[in-house]
């Protein structure tokens, strides 16, 4: 599951996800029957060039809510249960602060510590039963995990775009100052040349 943005002008926000997605597909999975679920237009456009895109969810950011994310999570869980996928990872930009985003790869399914918990022989009494609790809580937990990843990515996108635009503004201001200085120097040189020509002409007339 590759989470990117629908728009550009956000620095390396999307390209970092492209790089991580390609790296996982080629080095970790050795290009062995890898499929992507693309969340975001930029990721969908990039991944379609080289990989199989199982589905894309471009419009989710138009009205991001738990209900729409739950539908995606349910689809992923269903494909995992039906053994269409044997492992599902989520690749996204984790929000650290407005200026810093960290690309992370989280395992979505299978749940890594489920087997370890199952072998825990602690003497607990569950009401309702352990299986009923797991069947109820695990889907909710996975939906929340995906929702958090998308929200993190969304916040990171805005932070990355704000930082990129701030840098662009600073660069434009610096370029403007350089051009202004060059213009003033050229103007001063032109005025000096004109004065020299006038003085030279006056001296020639006097002679």
Give the location of each predicted region.
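C-terminal beta-strand-loop-alpha-helix "lid" module of Rossmann-like NAD(P)-dependent dehydrogenases
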Residues: 1-207
